């Protein structure tokens, strides 16, 4: 355990918040894309589809790198049990809160919007369970994955810490080219695992909990570990914060490959396996692109930025049902996709900010949506 706090990483805080807030334009653009979603506009937009695909191709990979970075930083700061408790509470409590308050009402809304209420009694027990697993976890899936990664990383982080204590500090002698090869092989390994499952027991791939707990965790664990390694080895982090023309060009080529796979691939063939390889390496390259841009443009302290850093999780949690409400009841009345998209951003962001300010004034809600226990008045007085 370290008593010396690490210097504040303002650009990483900002990037993490922006990646979270990107969920709003991502889901609103999904309404106007060619992808089939819960709610869709009458006529899809090609450029909003392109915008949606771009966000989807890299956002969460970069997010999990930052999560791994901060997780290991806090691992060194707290005793093991306290670290696990704090990390799980910070993501687990908001997730468990959002299920009854947000995703359950969202599920009921969609049942009426899609006129599925009459079909519900005809579903088997497993079909009901699986439907609820997909719909109630919904956009909260990454919180569940973070709980799992936090638990799994106890052994990994302990091993990292022991190696730091017993061996002399040395540079992480690994280039971005070598990292790219490693992540390409990891993508191939993930694709092979998925293909074997598809051959042996394809039905399990449609199981919501299996998808979230096993498949999503397997895909994102390399990025989470990479974040921890970036904290351990400053020179590795420097590789990501230094602009790389190769990573930028590689990410552009990977995105084109991603689009071609979306356009010409088949789910019954190798589309999902190909996508996993592409997004694995594109995610790595976009870490360099996003970190280098963020380090240059966002590495400063600002009250406004801090506000959105603190608000980003709450806004992300509430934006999804607001987006679906907008898509179901307001989108049909707006003929222009561009105007609809902009109105959606204003509608969702405006209401989310109002709800955020309201919840700050209710201590119970503030705790439930942040996982942070209230600071006792005695502690505040002592600090002051």
Curated annotation (Swiss-Prot):
It is a multi-pass membrane protein. Keywords: Acyltransferase, Cell membrane, Membrane, Transferase, Transmembrane, Transmembrane helix. InterPro entries: Acyl_transf_3_dom, Glucan_succinyl_AcylTrfase, Glucans_biosynth_C. The keyword Membrane applies. The keyword Ribosomal protein does not apply. Necessary for the succinyl substitution of periplasmic glucans. Could catalyze the transfer of succinyl residues from the cytoplasmic side of the membrane to the nascent glucan backbones on the periplasmic side of the membrane. GO terms for molecular function: acyltransferase activity, transferring groups other than amino-acyl groups; transferase activity, transferring one-carbon groups. The chain crosses the membrane at residues 17-37, 54-74, 91-111, 140-160, 173-193, 212-232, 240-260, 274-294, 311-331, 338-358. GO terms for cellular component: plasma membrane. It comes from the Bacteria. Its EC number is 2.1.-.-. GO terms for biological process: glucan biosynthetic process. This is Glucans biosynthesis protein C. It is found in: Cell membrane. The lineage of its organism: Bacteria, Pseudomonadati, Pseudomonadota, Gammaproteobacteria, Enterobacterales. Pathway: Glycan metabolism; osmoregulated periplasmic glucan (OPG) biosynthesis. It is an enzyme of class 2 (transferase). Belongs to the acyltransferase 3 family. OpgC subfamily.
């Amino acid at each position: 355990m370290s008593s010396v706090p690490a210097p504040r990483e303002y650009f990483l805080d900002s990037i993490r918040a922006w990646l979270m807030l990107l969920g709003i334009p991502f889901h609103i653009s999904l309404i106007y894309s060619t992808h089939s979603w819960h709610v869709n506009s009458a006529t899809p937009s090609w450029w909003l589809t392109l915008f949606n695909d771009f966000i989807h191709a890299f956002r969460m990979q970069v997010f999990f790198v930052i999560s791994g970075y901060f997780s290991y930083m806090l691992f060194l700061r707290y005793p093991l049990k306290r670290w696990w408790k704090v990390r799980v509470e910070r993501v687990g409590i908001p997730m468990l809160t959002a299920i009854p308050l947000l995703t359950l009402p969202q599920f009921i809304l969609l049942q009426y919007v899609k006129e599925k209420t009459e079909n519900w009694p005809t579903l088997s027990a497993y079909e009901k369970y699986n439907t609820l697993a997909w719909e109630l976890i919904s956009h909260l899936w990454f919180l569940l994955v973070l709980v799992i990664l936090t638990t799994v990383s106890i052994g990994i982080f302990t091993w990292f810490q022991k190696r730091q204590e017993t061996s002399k500090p040395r540079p992480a002698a690994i280039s971005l080219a070598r990292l790219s090869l490693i992540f390409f092989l990891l993508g191939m390994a993930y694709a092979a695992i998925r293909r074997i499952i598809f051959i042996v027991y394809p039905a399990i791939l449609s199981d919501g909990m299996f998808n979230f707990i096993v498949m999503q965790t397997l895909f994102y664990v390399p990025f989470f570990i990479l974040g921890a390694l970036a904290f351990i080895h400053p020179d590795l982090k420097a590789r990501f914060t230094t602009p790389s023309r190769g990573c930028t060009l590689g990410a552009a080529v990977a995105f084109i490959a991603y689009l071609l796979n979306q356009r010409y691939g088949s789910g019954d063939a190798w589309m999902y396996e190909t996508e996993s390889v592409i997004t694995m390496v594109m995610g790595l390259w976009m870490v360099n692109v996003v970190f280098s841009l963020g380090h240059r443009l966002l590495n400063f302290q600002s009250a406004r930025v801090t506000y959105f850093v603190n608000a980003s999780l709450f806004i992300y949690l509430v934006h999804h049902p607001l987006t679906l409400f907008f898509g179901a009841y307001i989108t049909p009345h707006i003929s222009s996709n561009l105007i609809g998209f902009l109105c959606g951003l204003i509608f969702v962001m405006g209401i989310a900010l109002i709800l955020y300010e309201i919840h700050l004034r209710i201590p119970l809600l503030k705790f439930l949506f942040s996982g942070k226990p209230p600071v006792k008045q005695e502690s505040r007085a002592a600090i002051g």
